Amino acid sequence: MTIRAAIIGASGYVGGELARLLLFHPDVELAQVTSERLAGKPFTSTHPNLRGHTALQYVPMSKVEPCDLLFLALPHGEAASRIEQFAALAPRIVDCS
């Protein structure tokens, strides 16, 4: 069974490392990555080490679709105020912020 995952706040170092691990995991499909500032731009514009491994583009948080597993890589303290919103998107959430 493939796990569909998304990363909220994927433009920083933590988001990039999460993406690298998930992209090479045989049981995970990295479905979406978010950045408000970079929405519409290629994910690899900020993580050139992953060129050739993904064609994902950044989407704003408002466009994130439900998934199986949601990773939060937001600046410290930002996730807590929006946990209800995130809980509606995935049954499992990992907060790395």
Walk through the language-model features, giving the residues of each.
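N-terminal Rossmann-like NAD(P) cofactor-binding subdomain of oxidoreductases
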Residues: M1-S97
